[in-house]
């Protein structure tokens, strides 16, 4: 499998952030994000964890009833990233 260059990885991360902004305030599962950006789930999860380290996305570990997910993860844009995106949209 060919290695993906860093500029292309950055573009994919931008696509993820944009998709989370558009779907905000709804949080999305990793599989939903992966299908939207046409990448496999493991690669998408790696990028999401990288974005989490940079405080650009937040991981949602509980369902609407308050139970923790055992194997799934949902993601949303962090509050600070949402404010920055929203400011640039206007």
For each predicted feature, which ranges?
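Short acidic, hydrophobic short linear motifs in intrinsically disordered regions
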Residues: 26-36
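Short, amphipathic alpha-helical interaction segments positioned at domain boundaries
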Residues: 76-90
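Short, Lys/Arg-rich nucleic-acid/phosphate-binding segment
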Residues: 61-73
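A short, conserved structural fragment
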Residues: 52-64
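Short helix-capping/hinge SLiMs at alpha-helix to coil transitions
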Residues: 21-25
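Short amphipathic alpha-helical interaction segments
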Residues: 39-53
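Short alpha-helical segments that sit at the start of domains
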Residues: 1-17
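Alpha-helix N-cap/helix-initiation sites
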Residues: 9-10, 26-27, 41
